[in-house]
Each structure stands twice: as structure tokens, then as C-alpha cells.
Amino acid sequence: MNRITQTEADARHVKRSDYQSCTVAFIDCKKPGSHLKQNYSIIGPGVTSSSEQVINLPEAHGFNIGAAAMPPGITNNLHIHFTAEVFMVYGGEYTFRWGSNGENEFVGRPGDILSVPTWIFRGFVNTGEDDGWIFTTLGGDNTGGVIFHPEILHEAADYGLYLSKDNQLIDTSKGDPVPGEGQRMEPMAEQDVAKLRSYTPEEMRQRVVATQDRDFRPAFVDAVLDGCGAEIAPVIGFGITQNRDHVARIRNPHGFSMEWLRLQPSQKVSPFTLADKMVVIPREAGLRISLNDAADVTVDLGEWDTYSIPADVVRVLQNTGDTAIEVLVIVSGDHQKRPEFRGDVVEAAFASGATLDAQGYVAEAHLIPNYGMVAE
């Protein structure tokens, strides 16, 4: 069990007002209709190509978290990722397009989450009436950069923009020399584009967890205790839920799990530790995180803030507001997560008829045998 100071805890709180945008993060930054796109690197660098990008929390987490903000009509052009890319819509309406020419689409609205497969072209446009906001989660600490659609690279060259082999943006209008052949990213050949896998809208819909798809259920062994009963709706992989009936719709390896946590007014998740780094992004204000066994360090989160909880630190999550809140929970790793509740919580839950089975899921206490044999 680790202990954290208030100063250390505050340094892991990236407030919404702390996010710093970059408008020259990608090679399409001068393309009309894309020039007003804002890129944010909140945890890790993401896939930015700009040396001007500010990274709020550069510490490695096993995944990257960023954001994109765009006025109505602005487009993020077609590109390929090598690791998982997950879009979490928090504000506005976005039309996501995929395919070699962006021929397929899905419209995302606040609360919707889309995981786009690797090695296919994808892009999106703000089709709403106001400025939109998308959080993104990328797999791995090193995402490998991106490959832009050949048309984008050809057009960028007309504006004096190139990408180096190490994913750095080269702007000849600022005095950067034109990179020679072998030193820059060349447009993908037609025959290579033709080999990319295609996904039908029906297949992609299985990689969407829309607001109406979410399956909220009581999630933890402390649900039998007063003031508890927090609910989780799985999105990707094996998360922190202790409910055996929870099954995430998106199950291929991403390098992280993702879930929605819902807390009613004054409701809490009792003190527990986790062996993995855990990031929370609330949709609404009111989440208070109390840290350490003594709960002597607290952090209050506003809407759309990002907070990173270190591994092996005791934490309590509580809704201090007077309306229900939803919080996105992202945890590193593809394995089943194992929250460890404090001993007094486990004992109180047992006395109220609930315990955990050997797989780490909630069960009725009177059904569990006292089986002490373990493999040597």
C-alpha cells in the first residue's frame, strides 16, 4: 500500500481549465476545413506531430488520453492508427467516417463511445450546431504515430508541409528544409490501400457502446452497505467491476479497460486499492476522491476534468452533489482488474451476506466454502 501527499495528489489532477490546445498537431493543419481543429495531449503525447504540443501529464500509464475540439463543420481527416483508438463523445455531435475513402459513417452524441479497429482509415467531422468535444484513449505508451490518407499528404505538400520518418511535422514556411526521399513519410501506395480490411456499418456498430446500450448494475461487494451500491456499465475489456454478469461489448485487447461508473447523490465506493493505474473523467461535477487509509488527502473534480490515481493507493470515490453523476473509468492492462477493499469493508459486507468468490466476483457469503488449499 502506497501513501500520497496532498501536493502529489494535486499534481495528478488535470482540470478542464488546464487543457492546452495545439492547432498545428497534424499535417492537415493548413487544409481549409481542418485548420480550426484543436488537439490536446492530457496523459502522454498521443500521436501529435508537433513539438509545440503541451502534455499535461507525461507519466507513462500504458495508454494515452487526449481530446479533440472542433467548431461545426471542421474535419479531422482520414488516417490510420497502429494501436487502439477509442472516441468518447462528451460534447456536440460528430460523424465518424471510416474506410479507404471514408465511405462508412456513424453519428456519435454525448455519452457514446466508439472503438475503431487498427489499420483502417478513420476520420470525423463536427456535424452539430456548436463546438464539440471528444476525449480519446490510445493504446500503449508509444502509439507509433499515424499514417494519413494519400490525398492528405499530397495536399499538405502544396502548403509546404511534410512528415518526417520519426513523425515530426516539417513546415517549410517556417524555414524547415524540404526533406529528401527516404527522410519523409510517402503517401501509401494504391495497392497497399486496397489490402486494408473493410468494416461494414453492422460490424462497426458492435464496436460502439452508445448511451442507450449501457448495462448499469451494482458493481461491488460493498453494495450491501449503507451509502454504497455504485453501478458500473462495462465498455471495453475486463475492468474493476465485481459483478459476474457484466460483459463488455468490446472485448479485443486494447491495453486498457473502460467502464462507466454511476454514483447517486452522496453514494460512495468504499476504500479500496488497485494494483494498476486508474484514470477517471467525470461527465458532471461532484466527484470527490479521498486518498490514503486515513482519507486525509482529497481532490474534488469538476466536469470533464481528468484525474490519475496511482497504483496501490487507497481511494474512496463519492458523489458530493445532489444529482447522479457518471464517471468514465480507464485502467491499464487487458487482464481482469482486482479491486481490494479494506478489511473492515469486507467484514461488514460478509456480515450483511456478501463476499467475493475465488474469481473475485460478488457471491452470497453463506454459499462460499472455507477452502484453504492453494497450488505450490
Residue ranges and their predicted role:
Residues 58-63, 76, 82-85, 104-127, ...:
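Polyanion-binding and phosphate-handling cores
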Residues 1-61, 163-254, 358-376:
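A short, N-terminal "cap"/entry segment at the start of jelly-roll beta-barrel domains
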Residues 46-53, 64-81, 241-246, 257-275, ...:
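Conserved short histidine dyad/triad with adjacent acidic residue
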Residues 75, 80-110, 120, 272-303, ...:
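A short beta-strand-loop-beta hairpin characteristic of the jelly-roll/cupin
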Residues 2-4, 121-199, 316-376:
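Double-stranded beta-helix
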Residues 70-72, 108-128, 139, 264, ...:
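Conserved metal-binding segment of the jelly-roll/cupin
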Residues 85, 113, 133-134, 278-279, ...:
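Beta-sheet entry/capping signal
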